[in-house]
């Protein structure tokens, strides 16, 4: 069976695969445009995106907006297919500025999690009014429960007469910061299969009343074409994958960052407590060992990039640690990774990865349903 397309209203991706936004700097225009050109949805991560701007220290908010503009334009220049998204965490201090920048640049989709993006439609309306034209950008929250999806549908409808254009449902096997309590991470009640089904049921009445589709995307631990088939059979419209795209030639991170995935063993995948107070999934290394022994201390904070960060008490600056890792300086940083990161055994091109996933999908689909 051929993989179905993924539709967000009038926008269509040929392949129902979203490359998850990965910061700091791991998914920029290089990776995002390569994924889009294979028919998927490429996503630029916005956290600390202005890191290379020479004026970042003086103007961190402006730097992030300027570089985001540059990255979106570079991606668009290199794209011949697919859709382009940006991932903007609600927890970012400059959330509004990044959102309005992305909309003004006519990005296809804004994915937003790390909190509930309750006012996202307001920014769409503001930019549309400023430009005096209707903008094409779709708004897709990232949630971890049917309850959160229901709240957003209800709030957006009552306040803005707007329904989400889709939902990404992120489960406890994802990499990076996790929207779960530590004790929920291995609880079957919070498995991705359970919460995807929960969100599908939560959005169903809203979709029926509006007489349109609200696609639900499965994310967090999705690794093979077989996984894709499983979630499509459940009623998901597509999947989001992050870890698989790190080990590609087009990934924007340093080669040392990618090799950390290739070299990882099952026991290297661990849960850490982030300085911002959330659990996170990462790969063990000497930096994290030093943190656990209390040997790390933050440098002066250039910009409080995350609202929840207490820079006075934080054992280290997570933004700087992730930036160091992106540059390949893993002695002074670490790598966020999904639960299946240890399965990565080589670096391939994005095209090779897509071809592999399509073959796996076909094999699994026909094995399960030989008709």
Please describe what each predicted stretch is.
Residues 1-209:
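Active-site entrance/lid segments in N-terminal catalytic domains of soluble metabolic enzymes
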Residues 18, 174-217, 223-371:
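Conserved active-site-proximal phosphate/metal-binding subdomains
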């Amino acid at each position: 069976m051929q993989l179905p397309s993924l539709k967000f209203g009038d926008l269509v991706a040929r392949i129902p695969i979203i490359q998850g936004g990965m910061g700091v700097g791991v998914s920029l225009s290089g990776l995002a445009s390569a994924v889009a050109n294979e028919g998927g949805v490429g996503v630029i991560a916005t956290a600390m995106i202005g890191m290379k701007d020479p004026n970042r220290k003086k103007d961190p908010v402006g730097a992030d907006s300027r570089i985001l503009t540059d990255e979106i334009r570079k991606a668009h220049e290199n794209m011949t297919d697919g859709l382009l998204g940006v991932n903007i965490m609600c927890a970012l201090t400059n959330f509004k500025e990044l959102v309005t920048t992305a909309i003004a640049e006519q990005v296809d989709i804004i994915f937003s999690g790390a909190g509930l993006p309750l006012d996202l439609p307001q920014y769409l309306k503001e930019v549309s009014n400023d430009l005096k034209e209707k903008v094409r950008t779709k708004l897709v929250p990232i949630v971890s429960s049917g309850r959160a999806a229901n709240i957003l549908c209800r709030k957006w409808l009552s306040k803005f007469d707007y329904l989400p254009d889709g939902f990404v449902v992120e489960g406890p096997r994802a990499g990076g910061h996790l929207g779960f309590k530590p004790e929920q991470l291995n609880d079957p009640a919070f498995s991705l299969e359970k919460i995807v089904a929960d969100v599908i049921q939560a959005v169903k009445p809203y979709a029926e009343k509006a007489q349109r589709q609200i696609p639900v995307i499965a994310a967090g631990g999705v690794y093979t074409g077989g996984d894709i088939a499983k979630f499509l059979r459940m009623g998901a419209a597509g999947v989001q994958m992050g870890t698989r795209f790190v080990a590609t030639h087009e990934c924007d991170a340093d080669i040392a960052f990618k090799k950390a995935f290739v070299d990882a063993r099952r026991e290297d995948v661990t849960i850490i407590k982030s300085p911002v107070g959330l659990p996170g999934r990462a790969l063990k290394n000497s930096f994290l060992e030093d943190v656990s022994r209390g040997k790390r201390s933050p440098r002066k904070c250039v910009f409080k990039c995350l609202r929840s960060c207490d820079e006075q008490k934080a054992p280290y600056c997570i933004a700087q640690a992730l930036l160091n890792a992106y540059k390949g300086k893993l002695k002074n940083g670490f790598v966020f990774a999904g639960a299946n990161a240890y399965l990565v055994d080589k670096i391939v091109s994005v095209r090779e990865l897509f071809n592999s996933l399509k073959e796996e999908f076909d094999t699994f689909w026909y094995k399960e349903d030989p008709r």
